[in-house]
Amino acid sequence: MGIANKLRLSSSSLSRILHRRILYSSAVRSFTTSEGHRPTIVHKQGLDILHDPWFNKGTAFTMTERNRLDLRGLLPPNVMDSEQQIFRFMTDLKRLEEQARDGPSDPNALAKWRILNRLHDRNETMYYKVLINNIEEYAPIVYTPTVGLVCQNYSGLFRRPRGMYFSAEDRGEMMSMVYNWPAEQVDMIVVTDGSRILGLGDLGVHGIGIAVGKLDLYVAAAGINPQRVLPVMIDVGTNNEKLRNDPMYLGLQQRRLEDDDYIDVIDEFMEAVYTRWPHVIVQFEDFQSKWAFKLLQRYRCTYRMFNDDVQGTAGVAIAGLLGAVRAQGRPMIDFPKMKIVVAGAGSAGIGVLNAARKTMARMLGNTETAFDSAQSQFWVVDAQGLITEGRENIDPEAQPFARKTKEMERQGLKEGATLVEVVREVKPDVLLGLSAVGGLFSKEVLEAMKGSTSTRPAIFAMSNPTKNAECTPQDAFSILGENMIFASGSPFKNVEFGNGHVGHCNQGNNMYLFPGIGLGTLLSGAPIVSDGMLQAASECLAAYMSEEEVLEGIIYPPISRIRDITKRIAAAVIKEAIEEDLVEGYREMDAREIQKLDEEGLMEYVENNMWNPEYPTLVYKDD
């Protein structure tokens, strides 16, 4: 009886065997004709073969092999032979060491990244336990600022593929390609097209590193199960001529698709992933401004998605701005009275402006007058200077924040006024940098901030990576004194004043918010990520610090508390989803059960659904 059972095959197993025999016979004919040798028979497909050091060829798998072995989408699109692979490895290794000295302030950052990456390859549970237990030390290694250097040198660092690659050449194939990913359930996708990686510009297919790093933080901070995350690169080409002309570049060596051709690729990708994983949350990351806003508006009311550059950066900045209000000893409701000069009108800058306007307007009653009043608190300066209604060909996204020409004339300003001129005349409470221009807040600009009408002015140098920060904390504190508030997008060390006092360098990292937004959306079952859910996340972060901490100039908590911060933000997001009647349930918890949870119950619900890196007991079961 036992032998009979072993010999009995299911119809699906028989179909797979017959299919493989057909592929084998065709492979024999093909290989024998063209290369004069028989193929090696393998019993693995997809990621299994990529993770087998004996059979893995990496980028040398031909397109025929990729289709035959279910590898399509699991490798960068450019096919290379072994000689090209060796040349790429040696060339990029040397280039990598040369560029490392211009990278993060920690000269060992790249070496640490490599060691962590090797651990990730060997033992995922141990990797995340190390990351969680040392999050303050290693978050800057797996994410900003080190990840910027990783992306710049991705082809040299590429060893084992992570995530999926969808390219312009895969049009019409994506619906089947998603099934090459082995996970039956995916909770979180981070997707990029590589067009605007941090402040480094168009890095093409190398941008996959930012998606990998972001998802590491989803696992470490939010407890998303690492078997249910998927980093994705959508390769539509690159306008980076240096990359495009590099024979060792791993991506498509063509200019970026534009207009409807571009939209068609993204549409097909979204339809494919939501067909296979209907409940997945997709975070868009580092898309250039013109597409970041268009895609957000195109998908946000249909899919569970958000854009971290537009909405996440905005949320963290709002939390910091509200913290700056508290640091002045004022209630957060005074936020609409703050005068803010914003340097930068890209996706991040406009995202912050929109979020700040909505927050102010809500505090003022959400009337049309409230929106007008809120809008009047911002002065936006881009590469061409102050944006006013007199500007020609103004970006539609920046249009609502263009100042009235006559009003500016009364203030002694005009279209194109410099940042220094604007700061001198406006005397703002806050100078907010989202320009990606390192050193933009020059000595002259910071000197002008001395005229601020605020009792405790704030400097937010939020651009990443470190070299793109508008100024350093040392620059700001040395000119404005120890009473100011400082925040940045990249990590800096606190400034010692020599009198026992410390200038706190608050890092306004997006990792404070996006893990909680993602986790809260996931556990609520909300079909969309609403503005209210995003605002709830910001206000939760702003209220996290104690009064004593805020008065000391600490407006963001230490990264070491990230699991607790994320848990509270996720609970706040779920609570807002309940109030907006967006809750649809998660797994065994239906909507009615979630709606009954009080604040303590929500916290417990979130904590119980956060993955922890512990070794499970394994039991073998024969198929």
Curated annotation (Swiss-Prot):
NAD(+) binds at R196, D309, N464. Gene3D superfamilies: Malic enzyme, N-terminal domain (3.40.50.10380), NAD(P)-binding Rossmann-like Domain (3.40.50.720). Residues 1-38 form a transit peptide. Its EC number is 1.1.1.39. SMART domains: malic (SM01274), Malic_M (SM00919). The keyword DNA-binding does not apply. Belongs to the malic enzymes family. GO terms for molecular function: ATP binding; cobalt ion binding; malate dehydrogenase (decarboxylating) (NAD+) activity; NAD binding; protein homodimerization activity; zinc ion binding. Divalent metal cations. Prefers magnesium or manganese. The gene is NAD-ME1. Optimum pH is 6.4 for homodimer and 6.5 for NAD-MEH heterodimer. In the presence of coenzyme A (CoA), optimum pH is 6.8 for NAD-MEH heterodimer. It is an enzyme of class 1 (oxidoreductase). One of its GO terms (biological process) is malate metabolic process. Its cofactor is Mg(2+); Mn(2+). It comes from Arabidopsis thaliana (Mouse-ear cress). Disruption phenotype: When associated with NAD-ME2 disruption, loss of NAD-dependent malic enzyme activity associated with an altered steady-state levels of sugars and amino acids at the end of the light period. It catalyses: (S)-malate + NAD(+) = pyruvate + CO2 + NADH. Expressed in leaves, stems, flowers, and roots (at protein level). GO terms for cellular component: mitochondrion. It comes from the Eukaryota. The active site is at Y143 (proton donor), K214 (proton acceptor). InterPro entries: Aminoacid_DH-like_N_sf, Malic_enzyme_CS, Malic_N_dom, Malic_N_dom_sf, Malic_NAD-bd, Malic_OxRdtase, NAD(P)-bd_dom_sf. This is NAD-dependent malic enzyme 1, mitochondrial.
